């Protein structure tokens, strides 16, 4: 089980096009299970993209904290779920209020969506 990030705009656009969107109160999650050949030929199982807009918070420190929280949420959900066996790509877009909400609440929401749709 290994996670890597989406590297460029082309990869983000491809996952947005192929993936299914799930709108939650504090974030939008795009999951693509049917990955193109360029993703399947790598050793990584999960491709993660995080988009944190300046509209969410103007301070880079806060935006980076949000990214760290998201990465940790994904690592927690991947380590104790059936995600280890399949290849998929995800894009997470946090919404307003993401930085104030309790971490365990975010973990519950994210794990419910991922486990329902995998």
From Swiss-Prot:
Its EC number is 3.1.26.5. It catalyses: Endonucleolytic cleavage of RNA, removing 5'-extranucleotides from tRNA precursor. GO terms for cellular component: ribonuclease P complex. Keywords: Endonuclease, Hydrolase, Nuclease, RNA-binding, tRNA processing. InterPro entries: Ribosomal_Su5_D2-typ_SF, Ribsml_uS5_D2-typ_fold_subgr, RNase_P, RNase_P_CS. RNaseP catalyzes the removal of the 5'-leader sequence from pre-tRNA to produce the mature 5'-terminus. It can also cleave other RNA substrates such as 4.5S RNA. The protein component plays an auxiliary but essential role in vivo by binding to the 5'-leader sequence and broadening the substrate specificity of the ribozyme. This is Ribonuclease P protein component.
């Amino acid at each position: 089980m290994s996670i890597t990030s989406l590297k460029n705009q082309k990869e983000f656009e491809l996952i947005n096009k192929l993936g299914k969107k799930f709108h939650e109160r504090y974030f939008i999650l795009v999951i693509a299970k049917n990955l193109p050949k360029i993703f399947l030929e790598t050793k990584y199982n999960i491709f993660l993209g995080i988009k944190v807009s300046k509209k969410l918070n103007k301070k880079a420190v806060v935006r980076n904290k949000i990214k760290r929280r998201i990465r940790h949420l994904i690592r927690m959900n991947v380590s104790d779920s059936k995600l280890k066996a399949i290849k998929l790509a995800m894009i997470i877009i946090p919404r307003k209020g993401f930085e104030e909400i309790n971490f365990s609440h975010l973990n519950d929401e994210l794990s419910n969506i991922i486990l329902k749709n995998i």
